[in-house]
Regions:
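FMN-binding flavodoxin-like domain, especially the glycine-rich phosphate-binding loop
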Residues: 5-8, 16, 20, 38-169
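TIR-domain catalytic/interaction hotspot
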Residues: 30-40
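A short beta-strand-loop structural module common to alpha/beta enzyme folds
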Residues: 19-32, 119
Length: 169
């Protein structure tokens, strides 16, 4: 993202996973082939504009998920385990809180991936989110604007829940 918050969360996740994870790759620099070589993926995105994926039409400075995701659509993701995380601002954008996360989720599910790491909606205050399925967020939700003090704790709890599904360890 333009603020670097998504990158910081990705790096924190990778650091906490240690040797179990490769270094994070910015989607701007990734190819579909890069992603498809892995059996397990952690994908993250901020929400920009009106609940949109980051990309040129949502005001991002570079191409991002908006341009990359169509390349991933239609790919066979069966046999892959995918965990998602999203960043949003529940106070400033509570009417579309982490909405972009649903686009990653729908693409993963449509491709046949096993999506893990659903996250409780408790502890957040927002009006609406499209990123909720079965009363849970489709991935870890980080609000760095209003709850940055909870970021590490949330990452730790989420990784504890998904680590074995992603790594087999």
């Amino acid at each position: 993202s333009d603020t670097g918050n998504t990158r910081r969360v990705a790096k924190s996740i990778a650091k906490k996973l240690g040797d179990l994870a490769d270094a994070p790759v910015d989607v701007k620099k990734a190819s579909v082939e890069d992603l498809l070589q892995y059996d397990a993926l952690i994908l993250g995105t901020p929400t920009l504009g009106d609940g949109e994926l980051p990309g040129l039409s949502s005001g991002a400075s570079d191409e991002s998920w908006e341009e990359f995701l169509p390349q991933l659509e239609g790919q066979d993701l069966s046999g892959k385990t995918i965990a998602l995380f999203g960043l949003g601002d529940q106070e400033g954008y509570g009417h579309e809180f982490v909405d972009a996360l649903i686009f990653l989720y729908e693409t993963a599910v449509a491709g046949g991936a096993n999506v893990v790491g659903f996250w409780p909606v408790d502890g957040y205050s927002f009006e609406k989110s499209n990123a909720i399925v079965d009363d849970q967020f489709v991935g870890l939700v980080i609000d760095h604007e209003n709850q940055s003090d909870l970021t590490d704790e949330r990452i730790d709890a989420w990784l504890s829940d998904i680590k074995s599904a992603l790594t087999g360890v």
